[in-house]
Amino acid sequence: TDPTKNLEINYEKDTQKAVTKFVDPSGNPIPGVNNIEETGKSGEPLTKATEVTTEITKLIAKGYDLVSNNYGKDNNGNFDKDSGKDQEYTVVLTTHIQDVPPFDSTNPNDPNTPKPGQPIDPENPTGPKWTEELIKSLETTKHVNRTISYVKEDGNKVEYTDKDGNKSTADVTDKVTFTRPAKINVVTGTIEYGKWTPVNN
C-alpha cells in the first residue's frame, strides 16, 4: 500500500434484530399471538410499526384492553448498535372485564337486558358481541314466592287485618326479588357473580 495515497475504508453497519412480544400484565404470552421479529442495520429505522399496530387492533377487537406499548420508544425508533443482544419491545394487554347490571329475563321491557348482536363492551363497538346463548347463561335476577302463616303456639290461626282493612286468618303470599351483579370476561366469556341481595321484602 502506498502511504502517500488516501486509504478508503468501507464501514458496513452491523445487522441488528428486534423482537416485539405481546403479553398479559403478568408477562405471559397472549394466546395465539406470535412475536413480531425484524432485522435491519444499526441506526436505521425499525420497520414493523404497522404490523404491531395491526396486531393490537385485532386483539382489541377480540376484547383485550391495551395497557402499554413501548415499541420503538428507544433509540428514536431506530435499530440499536448492540449486536450482543436483540432489542426487545413489549405490548401489554389485558382481557376486558365488563360489568353487567342485573336484569329480569322474564321482563321483555327491562332496559338492562342485553340484546344479541350488541357489543358486550359498549365502548368497543368492534369487540365481541352478545349471543343468545351467552345472554341465557346469565342469572342476575330471581323471584322467590313465600307463604306467611300467622299461627298461635297451639297451631290455631291468628286473626289479623289485611292491607284492605279486613279481618283475616288467610295465609299471605309474598314475592321477593333478588338481584346480583355480574362481571363478564369479554375475551373468554367467563362470568363471575356478586352476592344476591333482596330488592323488596
Language model regions located:
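Acidic/polar residues at beta-strand termini and the immediately following turn/coil
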Residues: 24, 44, 152, 184-186, ...
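Mature extracytoplasmic or otherwise solvent-exposed domains
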Residues: 157-165, 183-185, 189-193, 197
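Short, tandemly repeated low-complexity microdomains enriched for cysteine and small residues
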Residues: 30-40, 68-74, 102-107, 159-177
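Conserved "repeat-terminator" motif of extracellular CCP/Sushi domains
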Residues: 1-22, 78-145, 149-151
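Hydrophobic alpha-helical segments, especially N-terminal targeting/anchoring helices
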Residues: 22-23, 39, 73, 113, ...
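Structural motif
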Residues: 21-30, 148-160
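Solvent-exposed, conformationally flexible loop/turn segments
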Residues: 2-4, 38-49, 82-86, 117, ...
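Surface-exposed interfaces of beta-sheet-rich extracellular modules
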Residues: 1, 50-82, 191-201
